[in-house]
Amino acid sequence: MQIYKVGGAVRDRLLGQPVTDIDWVVVGASTEDMLVKGYRPVGTDFPVFLHPLTNEEYALARTERKSGVGYGGFVFHASPEVTLEQDLIRRDLTINAMAEDKDGNLTDPYNGQKDLEARILRHVSPAFAEDPLRVLRVARFAARYARYGFTIAPETLGLMRQLSESGELKALTAERSWKEISRALMEEQPQVFIQVLHDCGALKELMPEVEALFGVPQPAAHHPEIDTGVHVLSVLEQSAIHKHPLTVRWACLLHDLGKGLTPEAEWPRHIAHEHTGLRLIKAVNERFRVPRECQELALLVGQYHTHGHRALELKPSTLLELLQSFDVYRRPQRFEEFIAACEMDARGRHGFEQRSYPQADYLRGAAQAARTVSVQPLLEKGFKGKELGDALKNERLKALKIYKAEHVA
């Protein structure tokens, strides 16, 4: 029995990055051998075990063979006869197909270290094209390692295009797709993930609503970058620079989907794109079974981001409706994330990255002004039910009128 450290742990050590998760592969052992040594079985599709002391995962060396469509369409074979090289060749990229023994000796049959030094993401074998999930994984690695100057090998990008055109991406489950998408959006440069999907043809298969934004012009006076797709990439980039959570990044990606529906005759204006885009945002949310918090914020940002930009122009009554829509009294954090998404939208324009966004503080102040209105005096006056709700709304409106008069010249 030989045990090797494999995959990301080896890659990240060679890159000089912190190693967080360690994967182990065991060569020359059977399930019975592992059980005798106290390892606990946890794998369902193939033999994976937990170490009796560290709880780290140890997998028996295995081969795989394509047997159907999609990510799950594989037959796995694990036995003591499977070699380390056979196990490594089934992996996606050469930089992930290296192994180290207990003495730190490197096994690198597919030149992963050479590609790591050359900053190239390259597939290990033609079997890469058998697993559609690898399109998303490579795009995610491109986003993660963009700061190191990594690029995708042309032949690998070709296989990604082949997979995108095959229709197999549609066989991916919502859960698997969302897991990759959400992880990619939280990388340091998530816009690279979307750009790669666009370049290889996967974006039009997975999110045609986002793909449709590329080539759609916007008014140059407000959007020097002009292209809506380029704008969305910039907004997403800003959301990562400012280290916003997944909810904000997802909303940034989807906020302008309505512009993809604007008739060409109306370009570059996009009247009412906030409302026309809502059904598209809803469709994308449902397609990937997106978590509720991400769904809600994406819809709210899609509907109200123009309100955010025009905050200082809004009538107090419209401002109150905006606050009510966000349930700002009970869910202040959601409104704060809305403000963040609006600010990223404003900064995601060429030349506007460092511009101030006074709307942010104005909206925060408005929310605070409305929150300071107490219901207790109204209860003491005997208001109940609908009358109480109406009276509370009127008091908040008064507070917002005062707030606007004090803050807008």
From Swiss-Prot:
EC numbers: 2.7.7.72, 3.1.3.-, 3.1.4.-
Catalytic activity, as annotated: a tRNA precursor + 2 CTP + ATP = a tRNA with a 3' CCA end + 3 diphosphate; a tRNA with a 3' CCA end + 2 CTP + ATP = a tRNA with a 3' CCACCA end + 3 diphosphate
Cofactor binding description: Magnesium is required for nucleotidyltransferase activity. Nickel for phosphatase activity.
HD domain location: 228-329
Gene3D superfamilies from the UniProt entry: Beta Polymerase, domain 2 (3.30.460.10), cca-adding enzyme, domain 2 (1.10.3090.10)
GO MF assignments: ATP binding; CCA tRNA nucleotidyltransferase activity; cyclic-nucleotide phosphodiesterase activity; magnesium ion binding; phosphatase activity; tRNA binding
GO biological-process terms attached to the record: RNA repair; tRNA 3'-terminal CCA addition
Origin: domain of life: Bacteria
Residues at which ATP binds: G8, R11, R91, R137, R140
Residue numbers binding CTP: G8, R11, R91, R137, R140
PANTHER family: MULTIFUNCTIONAL CCA PROTEIN
Further details from the record: A single active site specifically recognizes both ATP and CTP and is responsible for their addition.
Protein's name in the database: Multifunctional CCA protein
Organism: Pseudomonas savastanoi pv. phaseolicola (strain 1448A / Race 6)
Gene name of the encoded protein: cca
